[in-house]
A protein has these predicted regions:
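Conserved AAA+ ATPase "SRH/arginine-finger" region at the nucleotide-binding site
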Residues: 75-78, 251-262
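The feature marks long, low-complexity, polar/acidic/proline-rich intrinsically disordered regions embedded
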Residues: 1-39, 43, 58-70, 98-99, ...
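Hydrophobic positions in the central parallel beta-sheet of the AAA+
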Residues: 43, 72, 185-187
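Conserved Walker B catalytic segment
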Residues: 155-225, 234
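Short regulatory helix/loop adjacent to the ATP-binding pocket of P-loop NTPases
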Residues: 227-248
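P-loop NTPase nucleotide-binding core
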Residues: 57-175
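The conserved Walker
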Residues: 45, 49
Length: 469
């Protein structure tokens, strides 16, 4: 049984073959940008967490490799433990320098990098004062002046040495890159926004100050909002203009467009075989029931701005609960989806539902209030136009009212199929007409419905089912 998605396979010859988001065109645009830049630059590829940036970057990297570019993929988060990211970044360059003819050049790069200070300049005065606490005041001042002058000269000499080493480092690195490739070297930096603030800022500084040479193009794959939070955390102030600070390091900013929800949701539903839940062995079941479920998912994803990762999690969660129930009731996927939505975004209402704290009418009124308007848009079902949410909405009510005393759907309403005006519904909704309810009632599978607790017990088995995590 499938409960999680594997990373997309990236084919060597056709890296975007498994691209389900139609993003190859963006890779082509970005490739055209870097193809005409031999001076070196830093490009930020911005997208929200869970938007598929890493998959896109790896596909694009392979595309560039196929075009003859030398590329490096550096996961900054995985190297977060390294005190100075310069070490890891140079090591990545070394992976391209394995041939004998490059070894001397790479050795020179390492030698010069080793001379560059890896720690911040000490605060000379603080160091000296701490050293002399408790000494005679006159001697302390005298010693401080003498030692301060000596320490200052030492730091100035060190500064000159580091500046010279920095110039040599850039020259040797440029020579190595020029030997490695005639085209720009493309250096991808991924997961920067997941690093601790100190490491994230240090990576930016190293990219800008040490690797700013012709023929190297850096691609920073980031969630700009999260990276801005890291910068504020680094400086210890929410008043820092983090976006302005980032502009010092980034030459070109490219926002990865949001994916096509329709196409991606269809892919997810197909991959998780939701059609099998609706049809099973019943080939006569109306196909519109499945399309309504897809539309339900699509509307929720759109109104809550779910990321790709959240959409995956949502549908895997529905599948997990459904399969745990060990039943073939086709109304359950939509009902589970509705309950997960309520649990994730309206926890108080969800707890009232689980604990049966609401009257039938109060539950209907609360659902009317909290559900997005997009879910009440009407869509063709069989020969009728009914709201997208009609079936899960009424299913929830049926399951909610199924107790020892309310054992069947017929207890909730009485329907004369030849005359919907005789419909006797024991609740009112501002979004549904009596005819809507009659059409729902006619579609019901006859017989007793399980209790709602039968479904919610499986939902409660895992805290991982919260969509906003």
């Amino acid at each position: 049984m499938q409960y999680r998605f594997k990373d997309a396979e990236i084919g060597v010859d056709s890296p975007f073959k498994e691209d389900k988001l139609g993003r190859e065109k963006y890779a082509n645009i970005l490739t055209n940008i870097i193809a005409h830049d031999h001076e070196g630059c830093v490009i930020s590829l911005s997208g929200a967490w869970g938007a598929g940036k890493t998959t896109f970057v790896k596909m694009w990297k392979q595309m560039l490799k196929n075009k003859g570019y030398k590329t490096i993929y550096y996961n900054a988060w995985e190297s977060d433990f390294v005190e100075d990211p310069l070490v890891a970044m140079i090591a990545e360059v070394g992976e391209l320098s394995q041939e004998e003819k490059f070894k001397d050049l790479f050795a020179s790069v390492i030698a010069n990098a080793g001379k560059i200070t890896l720690a911040a300049t000490p605060k000379i005065v603080k160091h000296i004062v701490e050293k002399h606490i408790g000494s005679d005041a006159a001697d302390c001042i005298s010693d401080m002046l003498e030692e301060g002058a000596s320490a200052l000269k030492e730091q100035i000499d060190k500064y000159y040495e580091e500046r010279k080493s920095l110039t040599s480092f850039r020259a040797q690195l440029k020579g190595l890159v020029d030997q490695l490739t005639e085209q720009p070297l493309i250096f991808f930096v991924d997961e920067l926004d997941r690093c601790n603030p100190h490491h994230a800022v240090k990576v930016l500084e190293r990219v800008k100050h040490l690797f700013s040479i012709p023929n190297i193009i850096f691609i920073l794959s980031v969630d700009k909002q999260q990276l801005s939070n890291s910068i504020r955390g680094y400086f210890g102030s929410d008043r820092i203009d983090a976006e302005e600070y980032l502009r010092r390091f980034i030459d070109i900013e490219y926002f990865l467009p949001e994916p096509n929800y329709d196409y991606y949701i269809k892919y997810l539903c197909d991959d998780l075989n939701f059609k099998g839940f609706f049809f099973g062995n019943n080939s006569d079941m109306p196909s519109s029931a499945y399309s309504f479920f897809e539309e339900f998912v699509r509307s929720l994803a759109g109104c809550k701005k779910l990321t790709l990762r959240q959409m995956q999690k949502l549908l895997v969660s529905v599948r997990l609960v459904y399969c745990s129930l060990n039943t073939n009731r086709e109304e359950l996927p939509g009902l589970i989806l509705l309950l997960l939505y309520i649990r994730s975004y309206h926890l108080g209402l969800y707890e009232d539902i689980v604990n049966h704290q609401l009257t039938r009418q109060k539950l209907v009124s609360e659902l009317d209030r909290i559900l997005p308007n997009s879910l009440f848009v009407r869509k063709k079902y069989s020969e009728y136009d009914v709201p997208i949410i009609l079936f899960p909405f009424c299913d929830l009510l049926v399951y909610y009212m199924t107790t020892d005393s309310y054992s069947t759907e017929s207890k909730l309403w009485k329907v004369d199929e030849s005359d919907t005006s005789k419909l006797n519904v024991f609740f009112t909704s501002e979004h549904f007409t009596p005819e809507d309810i009659a059409r729902y009632a006619k579609s019901l599978r006859r017989g007793s419905s399980p209790r709602l607790s039968y479904v919610t017990n499986f939902i409660e088995l895992s805290e991982e089912l919260r969509l906003e995590d």
